[in-house]
Amino acid sequence: MSFLNLNEIKKLIREYPLRKDREIITKFIEGEKLTERELTRALHMSLPLFTLLLLNKRFERNKQLSEEEWATTKVKKLDNIGTVRNLEILPLIDFHSEGDLLTEKGVSYFIKADDLGILFDTGLNDKQKHPSPLLNNMKALGVTLEDFNYIIISHLHGDHVGGDQWVQKKMFSLSGTQVNLKHVKAFTPVPMSHPTATTKHVKGPEIIVNGIASIGSIRNPLFFFGEVYEQAIAINVERKGIVIIVGCGHQGIQKIIDRVEVLFDTPIYGIIGGLHLPIPNFPGDDPTWSGLPVFKFIVTRRPPWEPWHTDDRDYTLDYIKARNPKLVALSPHDSSMESINAFKDTFKEAYIDIKVGKTIKI
């Protein structure tokens, strides 16, 4: 079978995180004589190594498929998007806050565009409380469910749809118990449902309402969790330009910006949200999965033995800087303080902190 290719196994062994065990695993694979202790150790390690090999096979296949899809997908300009005069983004959930508002490693932003209200993602609510941190922060900030005309879900991950339990059901929720959203229309990057809200699966780029568009659901592979489809939104602000709002940035900054520049002739004014830059280290309370930090090793577009480096962050910075944006705000829910400080140093007065309760006015 192809996944047992010896050269691939040897390559994986060279990259195996537990360096002290490489020699034992190599001897085991090549059939060399092992001591009883070495054999016991090799058997303990062979299953996770074999699992990593299978995951790597799936990842490489998905990576190829996603790149082929990206290369062959043709999108047309959204010439008739229109504009909004006023735009405000109020973070309701993120990792940093003003005062004593609740924080999570999740995202939920209240977008006010002229007279329209949009809820972008619905946070994490890790303990499935009701009312959730999102609802508690809304109450403290004077935001009500009636303020939302639309909900936009960036992607189907627990920290953006209200918790992992809703991921399994392909749903989103604002709290541990579903709330009445019968007046709301939701736009999702994959087929999703809600007990009361109307939902629409967004595949390609489309205008949601005057001045606001989805750039379309973009497919990308994750090593452990298969594939993720993520959409960002573009808001055309009168006399300023396109403001991009991103959930986690699993698409990669190049695909996000390239897609926006194909869709619109209007220059990019700003970019706000998560870009997944846990470089070089994330805060010590990064949630773990099987002993590995989630944001640094698990939900990335790379194998765990190829974590993100400062070069990747610098590439992101350079790609954004080349557009001369007037506003940049990086979500702390999936990026390290080192990355946030690098953004501050690069964009100077154009940089704005994302904090729960702190309104960003465009």
Predicted features, each with a name:
Residues 130-184, 262-276:
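Active-site metal-binding motif and surrounding structural segment of the metallo-beta-lactamase
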Residues 150, 157, 239-243, 251-357:
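Cap/insert and terminal regions of metallo-dependent hydrolase folds
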Residues 87-90, 117-118, 184-185, 211-213, ...:
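Structural motif
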Residues 92-95, 122-123, 155, 188-192, ...:
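Fold-independent oxyanion-binding glycine-rich loops
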Residues 2-114, 205-222:
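Zn-dependent metallo-beta-lactamase
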Residues 82-85, 89-141, 226, 230-245:
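Conserved beta-strand hairpin/beta-sheet module of binuclear metal-dependent hydrolase folds
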Residues 77, 175-233, 344, 352-361:
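Metallo-beta-lactamase
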Residues 130, 162-164, 170, 197-198, ...:
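Short glycine-/acidic-enriched loop or helix-start segments at secondary-structure transitions
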